[in-house]
Amino acid sequence: MGQTIKEIKARLAELTDLSAKEFLEFETDERAGVQAALKSRKKQILAECAEDERLEQMLEFEKELYSQEIELIAGIDEVGRGALAGPVVTAAVILPKNCKIRGLNDSKKVPKSKHHAILSEIQEKALAIGIGIVDAEKIDEVNIYEATKIAMIQAVSKLSLKPEHLLIDAMVLDLPIAQTKIIHGDARSASIAAASIVAKVTRDEMMKDFALEFPEYDFEHNAGYGTAKHLAALTKYGITRIHRKSYEPIKSMVNFKY
C-alpha cells in the first residue's frame, strides 16, 4: 500500500536538500495533495537557503576577525536618535562564534510582531548584553551625537565580558578597544543587528511606560517620533518632561508645558 498524503508531508518536512531522491519519487505521484505539498516544501527550502546565505553574509565582518583569532566581538547600535521625545537607547551584544539567528536584521527591517521572538533568541544565545540609556535632558545638554556616544560607552561598560573588538554602526567611540565603524552596519553585521533589536525593544517598552504617564501623545505607537497625532498633542497640551527641548518644534514651545 502506498504512503498517505499525511505520511508524505511528514517525510517532506524532514528533507532539506532539493536533490534528495524522495523529491523525484514523489513527483511521480499524481495526487493533487502530494503535488501541492511538493511545491510548498520546495518553496520553503529555497527560502531557507536564501536566509542561510543572507545570514552568512551578515557574518562577513565577524569572520574577518575570527580569522585573526578575535572572538569576543561586540556589535553596537542605537535607537531613538530622531525622536522628539524619550531617551536614546543603545545596546552592545557579544554573540558566540558563527551565531546565526533566523530573521535577524536591522530592527527597522524586521516586522514588529517578530521583535520579541528574535530578542528571546538573542538573550538565549548571546555571551553578553549591555544596554545604555541617555535621557532627553542629557541629549539637550550635549547634543544627540554626543549623547549617543555616551550611551554606547555605557552599553559596553555593562557587558559581563570584555570585548576584544567593537563593530559599531556609523560611530567611533573614545575607548581603548579596537573597533570598526560600519555604515549601515545594522543590516550588514549580525552582531550589530542583534544590538539593534535589543535597543529597539528596550526603548519601545520604555515608551509604552511613558504612554501611561502621558496618554495624550500616543507614545505607545509613535515611540516619541513626530507623527501627526504626536504633533497635534504637542499643539494642544504642550511639551512634557521627556520631550527634547533642543529639537524643533519643541524648541519653539519651551514655555508651553504639559
Curated annotation (Swiss-Prot):
Its EC number is 3.1.26.4. It comes from the Bacteria. NCBIfam families: PRK00015.1-1, PRK00015.1-3. One of its GO terms (cellular component) is cytoplasm. Its main location: cytoplasm. This is Ribonuclease HII. PROSITE patterns: RNASE_H_2.
